[in-house]
UniProtKB/Swiss-Prot annotation:
Subunit note: Homodimer.
DNA-binding region, residue intervals: 21-40
UniProt gene name: argP
CDD domains noted in UniProt: PBP2_IciA_ArgP (cd08428)
Lineage of source species: Bacteria, Pseudomonadati, Pseudomonadota, Gammaproteobacteria, Enterobacterales
PROSITE patterns (alphabetical): HTH_LYSR
GO molecular function: DNA binding; DNA-binding transcription factor activity
UniProt keyword list: DNA-binding, Transcription, Transcription regulation
InterPro entries in alphabetical order: ArgP (IPR017685), ArgP_gammaproteobact (IPR023490), LTTR (IPR050176), LysR_subst-bd (IPR005119), Tscrpt_reg_HTH_LysR (IPR000847), WH-like_DNA-bd_sf (IPR036388), WH_DNA-bd_sf (IPR036390)
Family from the record: Belongs to the LysR transcriptional regulatory family.
Organism for this UniProt entry: Erwinia tasmaniensis (strain DSM 17950 / CFBP 7177 / CIP 109463 / NCPPB 4357 / Et1/99)
Residues annotated as domain HTH lysR-type: 4-60
Name of protein: HTH-type transcriptional regulator ArgP
Length: 299
């Protein structure tokens, strides 16, 4: 069995984090040539490239797996160090999270962890249908996903559901839906999606109004918070988590355009096994807060 030297793995990790060999060498306090030699040593050990030498460099699939191993080991070392680690370099905590969770419940859930533990948080925003792939590739150590089944050597727990409402402003409703939300009216009503793979709005319209994909005009905006702003200013209708717009609904800035109809996304917390002390803190925090603010009754 090939057992990599973790010093050489740290060189690979530094090149990725620092986006180049020169800055990686400065970070590790060694020469650029030494960084190259350590990575070449790793590549010779595994008989394949571990780094795509682009600008910035990026890891190959095997490189991703090795980096995932390194990040797991770094977290597990915290078990042995205990709590007496003040003054040490904060541990990197890379998580893959959907934008709507980040905009609503996730950061409050992590408040205690970020306050009490020496960590550097690295949030990678991805659609909830694809976050698990980042965990599979070793880019992160934990992921919020809609997938209920764990990956090999991983753990999973249910967090709860986000309920999405089809909303818009009163002015938008008066302009585009004077006779109610109908199939023909929806064909002219501007919508918004997070990216070209975000199909929530389209799935809602297809399920409830038999509208085929691509049949409605749709903006692309990579911001959950911008969805709220666009809806409030009367320029789009869109699917937004109820949790995110409770105030706007209560004050009448936004209205539920299709009362009784919603999209529900059950969320699950995935992470590598075994868990370090830090990851158990993260798990406990996410589950406790998720069970408080996310919908648990899925009937």
């Amino acid at each position: 069995m090939k057992r990599p030297d973790y010093r050489t793995l740290q060189a690979l990790d530094a090149v990725i984090r620092e986006r180049g060999f020169e800055r990686a060498a400065q970070k590790l306090c060694i020469t650029q040539s030494a960084v190259s030699q350590r990575i070449k040593q790793l590549e010779n050990m595994f008989g394949q490239p571990l780094l795509v030498r682009t600008v910035p460099p990026r890891p190959t699939e095997q490189g991703q797996k090795l980096l995932a191993l390194l990040h797991q080991v770094e977290l597990l070392e915290e078990e042995w160090l205990g709590d007496d680690n003040s003054g040490t370099t904060p541990l990197l905590l890379s998580l893959a999270v959907n934008a709507d969770s980040l905009a609503t419940w996730l950061l409050p859930a992590l408040k205690t962890v970020l306050t009490d533990s020496p960590v550097r948080l690295n949030i990678q925003v991805e659609d909830e249908t694809r976050t698990q792939e980042r965990l599979r590739r070793g880019e992160v150590v934990g992921a919020v996903s809609i997938q209920p089944q764990p990956l090999p050597s991983c753990l999973v727990d249910r967090l709860g559901a986000l309920d999405y409402l089809f909303v818009g402003s009163k002015e938008f409703a008066a302009r585009y839906f004077p006779n109610g939300v109908t199939r023909s009216a929806l064909l002219k009503a501007p919508a918004v999606a997070f990216d070209h793979l975000d199909d929530m709005h389209q799935a809602f319209l297809q399920q409830n109004f038999d509208l085929s994909p691509g049949s409605v005009p749709c903006h692309i905006v990579n911001s959950s918070e911008a969805f709220v702003q666009l809806a409030r200013q009367g320029t789009t209708c869109c699917m937004i988590p109820h949790l995110q717009i409770e105030r706007e609904l209560a004050e009448g800035e936004l209205i539920d355009l299709t009362p009784g109809l919603l999209q529900r996304r059950m969320l699950y917390w995935h992470r590598f096994s075994p868990e370090s002390r830090l990851m158990r803190k993260v798990t406990d925090a996410l589950l406790a807060h998720g069970h408080r603010v996310l919908r648990q009754d899925t009937a």
